[in-house]
Amino acid sequence: KTLCAGYSAQLPPDVLAIPNLANCSGGTTGKTKVIEQDMPAGESDEGLRTWFSVSGMRFEMRQLLAGPLFHGAPHSAAFNGLYCGNTLVMPAKLDAETIVRLIKKYRIEYVQMVPTLMQRISRMPGFRKEDLASIEVLCHTGGVCSQDLKREWLEIIPPERLYELYAMTECIGMTSIRGDEWLRHPGSVGKMHCGRVAIRDEDGREVPHGEIGEIFMSWGDNSPRVTYKNMPPLPVDSEGFRSVGDMGYVDADGYLYFADRRSDMIVTGGENVFAAEVEMVLKKHPKVVDAVVIGLPDPDWGHRIHAIVETNAPVGSKELIRFALNYLPPYKIPKSIEFTDHIPVNENGCLLYTSDAADE
């Protein structure tokens, strides 16, 4: 306070002509990208109003930051929490045990987390939903949340207090859905806010409702100027539509459903397999804590499906394959399964898609 007392709170006008925000992407499949975004005057206020409506955050809550501040989603949650006068608790570690312990210790009311962390918490030995009794709002984002995991958490957090956001650091668009609305549209990530979403095929043509294609989004006239640092910008068409390579579909009511990243689609024997679909099935098994599915080169299949699995009790490959056959056709079943004590996650709590097997 003594140091700051001798300085004006006002910045000279030429120091920050246009407020700018820089965040890092998740970096789960490669080098993290630094993404810069201009924030013209007034835009931050409008963004905050949108945030309150889609995330469930209120003023003066006890808030836990379950992610690093250099990543977009935790940074936004922290910034907006400070704006709301929230008390912010910042964990030294982002493992499931630490998060649950701090929620109980500080009686946390608001928390935002990734589905990977939700899965690890629910698979903790001795976990009880009473451990999270203080939570008034939980908002999840930053990865695929299976329907089974979502329903599991809807038994822990009441539907009207569980929010889901689908967005990306590139700020091309955002959808959201609350738990009670999700129960009417299971599997959906919600509707687009302040803009439009289009699903297109490889030739750029829009596809019918219910058909999977590449997700394009546009804020219209409200699109922020977003650039990668030291990388080419995302292509944008005349209507402002851009894509980060996610795949999904829109139903007749305008609800968006996420399938997977285009780069995570495995072509095996001429068939397209989304890694996320196989991962979600494997994670249904009660002994599976986490699973990652990748495609490995194969002389017969082009690529074979390989799973890396973390378990909390002994289980064999044959048992998991038999289990998966209850939900998936044979061509989507892993041809090989690798067991590990711990699937690595990055600082954001998102799975890192790396394995010794990937070097084969």
Region spans (language model):
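Conserved structural elements of the adenylate-forming
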Residues: G6, P13, N20, V34-R58
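Gly/Ser/Thr-rich phosphate-binding loop
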Residues: N23-G26, Y83, E109-Y110, G126-H185, ...
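Conserved small/polar residues in nucleotide/adenosyl-binding loops
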Residues: S25, Y353-D359
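Conserved AMP-binding/adenylation subdomain of ANL enzymes
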Residues: E43-Q63, F70-E109, M124
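AMP-binding/adenylate-forming catalytic core of the ANL superfamily
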Residues: I103, V111, E239, G245-I333, ...
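Conserved beta-loop-beta connector loops within the AMP-binding
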Residues: H185, A198-S218, Y249-D253, A313-S317, ...
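Conserved ATP/PPi-binding loop(s) of AMP-dependent carboxylate-activating enzymes
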Residues: K191-M192, R205-V236, Y255, E271-V273
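Flexible lysine-rich "adenylation lid" loop at the C-terminal edge of ANL adenylation domains
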Residues: D203-G204, L328, T340-S355
